């Protein structure tokens, strides 16, 4: 196995260790001194991997995976970690599904055995499906009642038309009501394979114990490959669309396709995104739209990178009569970044801010564990904050100007308005 070291202060410490079992399952472990540990499976399967007739299946499986295995009923799964103060959780997005647990480190073997059981031996009982489908439909209806959330999905549909990346993760009620145990088993048979997932662990647990415990839990699972070919995104054509919604406020998205997860320019766009509409109250868009003019309550810029494409978008909500004014102000700020190279002081301040934000965010073991699992799944490694900081520090004003002119060109942007 591989162990990576990093220098912290004047002491050398183990940062993360990796190992691949004989059945192809990759393991990554990052130690810490916390009494709480996290572990789980990150599966390389999400919404974009569904067939047309099984839209919503990845998320559906994520819900039903807790509802019964060959040796456990739903009640036993629910209580297995809860009885020792731990919990089970999961999430689905466009490209992966993650099933994980949080617990006191002493209960690591219990968590691993349970996770392996539900990931590899779920039976998806039909009577549980019939109940859970209604729960998911309630989730869909709740989501549709929140235009500030729904518009993000509709925007991806706008820039990825007729493509799996443009689909809503939750699926469609009329399809969900047709799903059966067999459908769920067919989906997991395609993607829930050892070579198509990783197992991640963060906690005060000896790495040799990690390997032994995981190896024992998946000893009955053989090496298997996934024959999967993802459909590449179609040619991007900027679109402008207005949808009439019965809401008190207008909601607006402006953006385009962004860089994919392996593109070196992604770090530069990440910094520009933060300058424009990051979480800081001093972001350019927040100053221009909220602080100076009081036109919006919330304005934010977001960046999502997939394995072969990405999404850059700006969101704000405002009064209907202020929509055009706000859109002009957004384009004005984008033009400033296209036309004016950042000064040395501006670049230094932007780097310092985002490095501080990353540092604060990294002080969360659960987020670190999930980020580590996702990174190891897609990159085969996990970059600690120090490596990310180096890439940020290496950025130049010239690089950012080039990226701004490529990504923020007005003719390249799509606009979606709920009014």
Give the positions of each predicted feature.
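Charge-rich, well-structured scaffold segments of protease-associated domains
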Residues: 20, 76-226, 232, 242, ...
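Short pre-active-site segment immediately N-terminal to the catalytic Zn-binding motif
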Residues: 43-54
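Single conserved hydrophobic/aromatic residue that forms the stacking wall/gate
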Residues: 1-14
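His/Glu-based metal-binding/catalytic segments typifying zinc-dependent metallopeptidases
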Residues: 28-33, 40-42, 225-282
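Active-site SXXK
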Residues: 56-69
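Phosphate-proximal small/polar/acidic motifs at interfaces that engage nucleotide phosphates
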Residues: 286
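Active-site alpha-helix of zinc metalloproteases
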Residues: 6, 55, 199
């Amino acid at each position: 196995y591989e162990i990576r070291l990093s220098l912290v202060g004047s002491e050398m410490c183990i940062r993360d260790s990796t190992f691949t079992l004989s059945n192809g399952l990759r393991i990554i472990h990052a130690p810490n001194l916390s009494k709480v540990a996290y572990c789980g499976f990150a599966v390389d399967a999400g919404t974009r991997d569904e067939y047309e007739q099984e839209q919503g299946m990845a998320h559906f499986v994520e819900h039903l995976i807790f509802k019964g295995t060959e040796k456990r009923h739903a009640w036993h799964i629910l209580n297995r970690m809860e009885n020792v103060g731990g919990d089970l959780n999961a999430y689905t997005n466009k490209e992966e599904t993650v099933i994980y647990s949080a617990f006191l480190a002493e209960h690591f073997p219990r968590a691993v055995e349970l996770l392996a059981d539900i990931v590899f031996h779920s039976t998806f009982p039909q009577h549980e499906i019939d109940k859970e489908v209604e729960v998911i439909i309630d989730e869909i209806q709740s989501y549709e009642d929140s235009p500030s959330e729904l518009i993000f999905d509709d925007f991806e549909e706008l820039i990825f038309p007729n493509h799996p990346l443009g689909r809503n993760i939750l699926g469609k009620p009329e399809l969900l009501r047709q799903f059966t145990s067999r459908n769920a088993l067919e989906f997991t048979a395609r993607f829930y394979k050892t070579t198509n997932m990783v197992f991640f662990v963060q906690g005060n647990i000896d790495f040799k114990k990690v390997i032994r415990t995981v190896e024992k839990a998946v000893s009955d699972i053989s090496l298997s490959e996934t024959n999967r070919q993802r459909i590449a995104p179609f040619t991007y054509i900027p679109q402008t669309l207005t949808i009439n919604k019965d809401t008190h406020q207008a909601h607006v998205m402006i953006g385009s396709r962004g860089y994919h997860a392996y593109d070196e320019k992604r770090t530069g766009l990440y910094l520009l995104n933060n300058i424009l509409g990051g979480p800081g109250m001093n972001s350019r868009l927040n100053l221009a739209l909220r602080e100076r003019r009081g036109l919006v309550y919330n304005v934010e810029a977001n960046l999502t990178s997939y394995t072969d494409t990405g999404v850059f978008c700006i969101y704000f909500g405002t009064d209907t009569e202020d929509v055009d004014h706000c859109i002009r102000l957004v384009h004005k700020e984008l033009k400033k970044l296209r036309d004016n190279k950042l000064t040395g002081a501006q670049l230094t301040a932007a780097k310092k801010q985002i490095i501080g934000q990353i540092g604060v965010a990294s002080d969360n073991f659960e987020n670190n564990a999930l980020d580590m699992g996702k990174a190891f799944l897609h990159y085969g490694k996990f970059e600690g904050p120090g490596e990310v900081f180096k890439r940020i520090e290496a950025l130049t004003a010239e690089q950012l100007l080039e990226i701004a002119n490529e990504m923020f060109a007005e003719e390249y942007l799509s606009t979606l308005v709920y009014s």
